[in-house]
């Protein structure tokens, strides 16, 4: 699927699925993703539910050149500074767990530190909040965090609410308004398993897909990557 970017995830476990990868050569997995053509790598560093570690991200940073998203649920400013220190290029801000003031100030802080933020939404209200806080990268999670059910059409339905460029008025006081409008990046997350899923999302104007478990469970990640891209 030419024209859609892949954010590939390195994760050992998750709250909904438990242990995903008992054998976890995370640096090798990250290098495999990069070699396959991933645009970015998502890394879970949260120790309890995702069995992650800051060390994972630091070690991967030393071995790959593509951007790293720290996929932990950001809940305070400290975590944003920490993400910068360990080598992340982007942090995750989830609308469901942050209020509007937090979303806007955390986004500004990330930008000030030279990082991006993936602002995650799950429904219409959250998408509107993500746009209002000045998000330049909006991710729609196809998994309902309350019930864990997955519906890929969630991304398809919500795409129509997303403007093609980031509204300049919301850029925040510390960030200068760019003279050229910044393109909005729309990401679909969770439950993406087949080329058909990707074709459907691509046809609907999705810029990137974030794929975790599907890749983590695959014995040949490079082959799967090629299949999903339709190569």
What are these regions (language model features)?
Residues 27-39, 132-144, 204-207:
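Structural recognition of alpha->loop->beta junctions
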Residues 82-102, 139-148, 206-225:
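Glycine-rich phosphate-binding active-site loops on the catalytic face of alpha/beta enzymes
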Residues 157-165, 202, 215-231:
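C-terminal helical cap(s) of enzyme catalytic domains, especially alpha/beta-barrels
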């Amino acid at each position: 699927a030419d024209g859609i970017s892949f954010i590939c995830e390195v994760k050992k476990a998750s709250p909904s699925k438990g242990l995903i990868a008992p054998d976890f050569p995370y640096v090798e997995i990250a290098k495999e993703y990069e070699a396959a053509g991933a645009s970015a790598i998502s890394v879970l560093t949260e120790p309890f539910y995702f069995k992650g570690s800051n060390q994972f991200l630091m070690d991967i940073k030393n071995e790959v050149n593509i951007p790293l998203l720290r996929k932990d649920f950001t809940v305070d400013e400290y975590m944003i500074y920490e993400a910068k220190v360990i080598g992340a290029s982007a942090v995750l801000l989830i609308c469901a767990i942050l209020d509007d003031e937090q979303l806007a100030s955390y986004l500004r802080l990330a930008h000030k530190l030279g990082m991006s933020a993936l602002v995650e939404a799950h429904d219409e209200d959250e998408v509107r909040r993500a746009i209002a806080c000045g998000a330049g990268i909006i991710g729609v999670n196809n998994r309902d965090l309350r019930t864990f059910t997955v519906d890929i059409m969630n991304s398809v339905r919500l795409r129509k609410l997303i403007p093609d460029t980031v509204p300049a008025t919301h850029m925040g006081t510390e960030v200068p308004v760019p003279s050229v409008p910044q393109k909005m990046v729309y990401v679909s997350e969770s439950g993406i398993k087949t080329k058909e899923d990707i074709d459907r999302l691509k046809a609907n104007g999705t810029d990137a897909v974030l794929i975790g478990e599907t890749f983590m469970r695959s014995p040949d990640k490079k082959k799967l990557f090629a299949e999903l891209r339709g190569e």
